[in-house]
Structures are given as C-alpha cells and as structure tokens.
Amino acid sequence: GLKNCILLERSELTSGSSWHAAGNVHVISSDPNISRLMAYTINLYKEIEKTSGHSVGFKPSGGFYLASNEVWHDYLKRERSKARYMGLDQEFISLKEVVEKNPLIDPKHYIAALWDPIDGEVDPSGVTYAYAKSAKVHGAKYYTNTPVLETKQRLDGTWDVITKKGNINAEIIINAGGLWAREVGKLAGVNLPVQPMEHHYLITEAIPELKERGEEKRIPVGTDFEGNIYFRQEGHGMLLGTYEPKSTPWQVNGTPMNFGHELLEPKLENIQDRLAIGFKRMPALEKAGIKNIVNGPFTFGPDGNPLIGPVPGMKNYWVAVGVMAGFCQAGGVGKTIAEWVIDGEPSIDV
C-alpha cells in the first residue's frame, strides 16, 4: 500500500460525530455489498488492536434481529440467504432462546429472530485511536488541530492543501470530512449531496435483572425492525436508540467550524412513538429511570449508504462521506477507497 499518507484533523480525533456514537456493530444490511464492508470492518478490529496496542473495547455479544410480523419475517429470510451466499454465519433462533439471551424482552410481540454471533459493540474513542496508531505504524502521519483552509489544484493535477500550520502538495485528496464533508468539498468547488441529521438514543439507570446476570451473561445487541429501534446493554442499564422517521436536518446551510464535542438539545417528541414501542416490548425499560439522553448529528447520504469514490470530472479528488454507520462500515470503506486508488478498482462493487 501507499506509505506517504497524511490525515488532517481540524480539531481532535473523534470530534464531530464519532465521540457520541452508540458503538454498535453488525453486518446485516439490505445491500449485500454494505454487509461485506461491515463484516470486513468487524474482523479488522482485532488486527488494528494488535497492531496499535490500543484497545478497541470490542464486546462480541452477538446480536439478534426481531420480526414482529410476516413482512419482516420474509425480510429476515432474504437476509439469511444473502448472508449464506457471503459466507456469514446467521441462523434463526427460537423466541425461547431470545428470552434466554435477553430476559427483558416480551416474546409475545415477535414471531421470528435471526441471530448473528459476530455482532457486538465497540468503544468509539478506542477504535478511532487504534485506527490512527495503526496507520502510523504502517508509515502514515496524522496532525490534529490542523483545519484545511484552501485546496488548489495545479496544472499537473496535484493539489496544494493550505493549512494554518503550513502547506502540503498532495497527489490526491480524499475528502473524509464527516460533518464537514460539504465544507471541505466546497473548497475544491464540489457540492456533495450529504446532510447531517439529528439522532437520539437514551441510556437507562441500572435494571435489577441485568445486575443479577453479571457481565458474563451480557445481553446481545438487538434490532426491532418494525419498531425501528436498536438496543444493547450499557453497564447495568440499557441503551435504546432509533433512526427516527421524523428526524430533523441539522445545519442545512453548513456545519459550524467551532462545533466539535457538543450535543444537541433532545427532541423527545420526535421519538416518543418509538420509545413507546421499545417500552412495550421490553417493559423493564419503562420502569427504569433515564440516566442520559444523547442527541447528536450524523451525516447521511441520499440513500443512507456511504458516498465513496472519485468525483466525476475532477482529477485526483475522492470522497468517503455520508458514512452514518461509521463504526460498522469505516474499515470496509477505507479498504474500498485504498483498493480503488492503488489498484484502479475496488474488490467490492460499490
């Protein structure tokens, strides 16, 4: 691979969206190629932890996907077929097994469950620093508190990247600007179709049933498709989140340059119907107090999938943006971009 790579971070590593992510990792996706990116990412965590010597905090609890009606049951059947085609180990389990793994669930609301043993959770900060340290081991450099002020292309196709700490002449630019992808793109005259959206999750106080189980019986990650909710254990409580249908676009006219490690004011009215479903299907959550509510922005592409590849009509300018499920997909996205730049095409059709 290429050794002379430089990462420029406008503030500190994890600034923007990474620091407040829930950290769930899974491989199921309606797009099989995205599932491949996710599976690669999860397997990569072991490698970067070993290379960097920095823990990623991976807890492979496994994960199940719950169907409450035949529509979602059929969807899970299709997902299992795709998983088998890709060599992934997903199997249907009984609702009795679901309750054994998560006694908080009321099984009367479900008719089927698909189990994936490699799902789990990671520490977002740990993963970010493990990536950075691993890249450094392999010859890359990264600079924090180095915002890019201008990007100017020379006649030979290379780029002058102007920062407050000095200038860099680069053969190519890869825009992986996250919340600031639009702003970085505009420096080169590129308007990217991505938009930050507000996203909520909450963490409950300790739940007696979880304290009694102990860490060795950690509850798996779970997804309820009809409810559009996801959940996992957090300490002795639970984390409950939703990709809300009534999500609010954030900073349509541009991400503030002084934004970094802030959260947004919760808008519980946007998720109260989702919370009601979660409380109904896991009654213990309704009885538990709420310890924390997180509302933070994530960047989405038009179809919810990452926007990856060379920008048409521009020489030596690439993007890896709109990666809203970064801790599931980032490793695979990085692999795809690296193959595309070095080999001329990626091994996965994106």
Where are these regions (language model features)?
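Glycine-rich FAD pyrophosphate-binding loop
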Residues: 2-19
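C-terminal catalytic lobe of FAD-dependent flavoproteins
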Residues: 226, 235, 257-350
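Helix-loop-beta segment of a Rossmann-like dinucleotide-binding subdomain
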Residues: 56-65, 79, 99-138, 160, ...
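Helical element adjacent to the flavin cofactor pocket in flavoenzyme catalytic cores
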Residues: 114-172, 180-183
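Flavin-dependent oxidoreductases
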Residues: 150-265, 273-284
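Dinucleotide-binding Rossmann-like beta1-alpha1 core, especially the glycine-rich loop
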Residues: 23-101, 226-231, 235-237, 265
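Short beta-strand to alpha-helix junction loop
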Residues: 36-39, 66-75, 114-137, 143, ...
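Short Gly/Ser/Thr- and Asp/Glu-enriched loop/turn motifs at secondary-structure junctions
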Residues: 59-63, 197-198, 293
